[in-house]
């Protein structure tokens, strides 16, 4: 089984108004932890979409118009991801997506590759989230009085990192920083059972 560890950066939280600005992913063997492939790019957007940016989102991720206008077109990004997933065998029952917040990442990912195309390519429809994994693991420990409840420590990615005594995510928030931090937290919480 392979995991597609994925993160996106956007110019706001509303997928009806805002657009994906950056995507990063790593394709990882979930038994060994071996990284098979990685992909990261800034996604160009038209000036009209940029002008609708939420300023708080841009403050967090630090993107500027100069960076965005030089990005790869959404069509180019889509084709590169399709080619990479085909090469790596990202298919239903053989892979899952893993994110910090898949309800957010999935809807913006679908701006690049729509749900019908994903279905046609037999891509996984399971998008797993780190927070739920952490929640389940810490609830089990809390039942045995070996851990505080997850709502006492928090379940943001930085809170999960702190729980495992890991550093917080590098700033500014960029997609590959998010993927690297997600993998670090995933390994601490869940692990790779056959990692050498």
Residue map of PLM features:
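Conserved non-catalytic scaffold segment of RNase H-like nuclease domains
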Residues: 1-103, 162-167, 173
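Short, surface-exposed amphipathic charged segments that create phosphate/polyanion-binding patches used
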Residues: 55-58, 137-145
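Amphipathic alpha-helical interface surfaces
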Residues: 77-81, 105-108, 112, 126-130, ...
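Acidic, Mg2+-coordinating catalytic module of metal-dependent nucleases/exonucleases
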Residues: 96-103, 107-112, 145-196
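A short alpha->loop->secondary-structure connector
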Residues: 114-124
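Short, flexible loop segments at boundaries between secondary-structure elements
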Residues: 123-142
């Amino acid at each position: 089984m392979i995991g597609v560890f994925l993160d996106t950066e956007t110019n706001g939280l509303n997928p009806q108004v805002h657009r994906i600005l950056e995507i990063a992913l790593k394709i990882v063997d979930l038994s060994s932890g071996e990284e098979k492939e990685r992909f990261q790019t800034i996604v160009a957007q038209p000036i009209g979409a940029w002008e609708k940016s939420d300023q708080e989102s841009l403050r967090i991720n630090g993107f500027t118009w100069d960076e965005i206008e030089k990005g790869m077109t959404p069509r180019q990004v889509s084709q590169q991801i399709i080619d990479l997933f085909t090469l790596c065998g990202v298919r239903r029952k053989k892979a899952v997506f893993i994110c910090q917040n898949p309800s957010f990442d999935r809807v913006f990912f679908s701006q690049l590759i729509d749900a019908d195309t994903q279905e046609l390519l037999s891509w996984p429809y399971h998008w797993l989230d780190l927070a739920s994994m952490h929640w389940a693991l810490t609830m089990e420990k809390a039942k045995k009085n070996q851990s505080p409840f997850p709502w006492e420590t928090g379940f943001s990615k930085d809170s999960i990192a702190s729980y495992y005594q890991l550093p917080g995510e590098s700033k500014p928030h960029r997609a590959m920083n998010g993927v690297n931090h997600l993998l670090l937290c995933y390994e601490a919480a869940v692990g790779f059972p056959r990692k050498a």
